[in-house]
Amino acid sequence: MAVPARRTSKAKKNKRRTHKGLTTPGLSRDSETGEYRMSHRISPDGTYKGRTIIEK
């Protein structure tokens, strides 16, 4: 089996893992209720972009 000739440094290891970081969710303030919610999602009262999508 192959064995690494040199030990991988912390910097090299961390540079390789930069893509594994967490990202913040896309939150936006709802214009009607003023609450934060996920972008491109229907609000709890069934409206999206000012239109009623789901009748309650």
Swiss-Prot record:
Ranges of Basic and acidic residues composition bias in the record: 29-38
Chain residue ranges for the region called Disordered: 1-56
Stretches with biased composition (Basic residues): 7-20
Gene Ontology MF term list: structural constituent of ribosome
Cellular component, GO annotation: cytosolic large ribosomal subunit
Keyword Ribonucleoprotein: yes
GO biological process per UniProt: translation
Keyword annotations from UniProtKB, A to Z: Ribonucleoprotein, Ribosomal protein
Family: Belongs to the bacterial ribosomal protein bL32 family.
Protein known as: Large ribosomal subunit protein bL32A
Organism in which the protein naturally occurs: Listeria monocytogenes serovar 1/2a (strain ATCC BAA-679 / EGD-e)
Lineage: Bacteria, Bacillati, Bacillota, Bacilli, Bacillales
Originating gene: rpmF1
